[in-house]
């Protein structure tokens, strides 16, 4: 596990339930700058309130499906934590194409950006549903794990 002290860290899905907790923890670990990337302006606003507008945080609106925007977010990052995902099993079952675009293509976009920009450490947040998947969500997260390896 890399040290986060004095590092520039990007968190995708920063406004989500897991991403927002990761962001709070990273600030307590002494990051130099925290790049909070999320598709939802409202989620980023809520996160900004939760972390009391910590001056080390930058809030970046964007979608992991958008390669160019994602690549701009990755610039200068020492560490990337990928928490962006469609994670609700029921919604992924109803919207399998969207789940694939976000969970698989979005992960590939991030890995490509990290390789291009020589990011030293990248961490994927996954789920127990990726082991022996029985759902669209589990299958897409399993594929994301394979991309990340």
Sequence positions of predicted segments:
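Adenine-nucleotide cofactor-binding loop residues
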Residues: 40-42, 65, 87, 105
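A short, basic/flexible loop-to-alpha-helix module at the beginning of a structural domain
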Residues: 1-7
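Short, conserved SAM-binding/catalytic segment
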Residues: 47-54
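Conserved Rossmann-fold cofactor-binding substructure of NAD(P)-dependent oxidoreductases
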Residues: 57-79
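N-terminal Rossmann NAD(P)H-binding glycine-rich loop of SDR-like oxidoreductase domains
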Residues: 8-29
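Conserved Rossmann-fold NAD(P)-dependent oxidoreductase catalytic core, especially the SDR/UDP-sugar
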Residues: 79-82, 86-145
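Residues at the starts of beta-strands that form the adenosine-phosphate
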Residues: 32-34, 56, 120-121
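Conserved glycine-rich Rossmann-like NAD(P)H-binding loop of the short-chain dehydrogenase/reductase
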Residues: 30-46
């Amino acid at each position: 596990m890399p040290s986060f002290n004095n590092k520039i860290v990007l968190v995708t899905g920063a406004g989500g339930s897991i991403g927002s907790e990761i962001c709070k923890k990273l600030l307590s670990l002494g990051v130099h700058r925290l790049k909070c990337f999320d598709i939802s302006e409202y989620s980023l606003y809520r996160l900004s309130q939760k972390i009391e507008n910590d001056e080390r945080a930058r809030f970046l609106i964007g979608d992991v499906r958008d390669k160019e925007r994602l690549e701009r977010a990755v610039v200068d990052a020492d560490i990337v934590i990928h928490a962006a995902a469609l994670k609700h099993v029921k919604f992924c079952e109803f919207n399998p194409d969207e789940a694939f675009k976000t969970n698989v293509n979005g992960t590939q976009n991030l890995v490509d950006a990290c390789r291009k920009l020589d990011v030293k450490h990248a961490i994927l947040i996954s789920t127990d549903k990726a082991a022996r998947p029985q759902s669209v969500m589990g299958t897409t997260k399993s594929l994301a794990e394979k991309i990340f390896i």
